[in-house]
Amino acid sequence: MDNKKRIVVLGGGESGAGAAVLAKVKGFDVFLSDRGKIAAEHAALLKKWEIPFEEGHHTEELILNADEIVKSPGIPTSAPMIQKIMERGIHIISEIEFAGRYDTAKKICITGSNGKTTTTSLIYYLLKEAGLNVGLGGNIGKSYAYQVATEHFDYYVLEISSFQLDNCYEFHPDIAIITNITPDHLDRYGYEMENYVKAKFRITRNLRPEDCFIFDSDDAITINHLNKIVTEAKKLPFTQETKVKQGAYLDNDKIVVKYEDDECDIFLKELSLGGKHNVYNSMAAALAAKATGIDNEIIRNSLETFAPIEHR
C-alpha cells in the first residue's frame, strides 16, 4: 500500500473536473463521484488524465476513506453524503481553496449579489489591456484549479460565489471586492440573511495589511457588517453619494479614483457601459486596476472600449 493522500472530489462539473486534474498533477490518490450524469466533455477530461470516477450514484466506501474532500459549490451541506462526511470528521474544502494552495499568482477576487460578473470581466479586460499575463476563473470561464494545474499566470481575476467561499479557509486574495449584498440564495443559509452576509465576507478573512478591500460604501448591508469585523487590509470604498480620500466617488459628470498619492478621472459619458449600476462596477474595476499599478490612460481607454463578452 502506498501512503498517498486521498482526495475525493464530489461533483463532476467544470469545478470538480478541474480540481480532480489538479489533484492528479500534484500526485494525490484521486477519485471523483457525481450523483448525477457527468457531461461528456468533463468525462473525457477525466479519462484523458486517467482519473477514476463514478456517475449516477455515490459509493460510500470509495468516498468515506478520503483524507480530504473537494466539494463542488452546487452541493448543499444538507446533502446526505455531505452529512456522512461531516460525521466522519473529514475536512471539506472548495475548488478555490484547493487551487489556492498551489497558486503563487496575485489574485483579484470578486464576490457580491449583483454586478460581480461584469466587474470581473472589466478587471480581466483592464489587466489584459495593460499587457499583464492574467487568467480568468472561479464562477466564470475555465476552472481555476484546471488552470493552476495546466497553465502559468502572474495574475488571476476570480469571480467567487458565496457557495465557493463557504469552504474556503486559508485562501488569500491580494485584492478582495464585494460589489454589494442583497438577499439571495437564502435557502442555503437557513433563511438567515446574517449567514449569507458572513459567507460573502469570508473573502476578507485572510487579508493582510498590504492587501486591498474594495467595497460599495453606499450599500447599507455591507457597511453594517464591515463595522462589526476587523480587517487589516487597505479599505477602498466606492460611492455615488459622498466623497472619499481613498477610493472612488462621483464628482458631477466624472468618476474620481484616488489610490495612495495618485488620482484618475474618468468622464461618465466616456464609459462603454451605461446605467447607474455600471458606474459602480466601473468604479470597483478602476480601483482594482489602480491597486495593481495600471496607468491612468490604460484604465480610461479600457473603460471606454470594454464590450461585454461571453466567457462561459
Predicted features along the sequence, with ranges:
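N-terminal leader/targeting and accessory segments in enzymes
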Residues: M1-S94, F98, G274, T292-E297, ...
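Surface-exposed charge patches
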Residues: V21, A44, Q83, Y125, ...
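Short amphipathic alpha-helical face segments that pack within enzyme cores
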Residues: G18, L122, S143-Y146, M283-L287
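Residues in the short beta-alpha loop(s) of Rossmann-like NAD(P)-binding domains
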Residues: G13, G36, I140, D218-D219, ...
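Adenine nucleotide phosphate-binding catalytic loops in nucleotide-utilizing enzymes
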Residues: K4-K5, L10-G12, G190-V197, E232-R312
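Short linear Ser/Thr-Pro motifs
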Residues: S15, S33, S72, S113, ...
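Glycine-centered flexibility sites
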Residues: G11-G16, G56, G74, G112-G115, ...
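Phosphate-binding loop of NTP-binding sites
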Residues: K4-R6, K24, E61-L64, P73-S217, ...
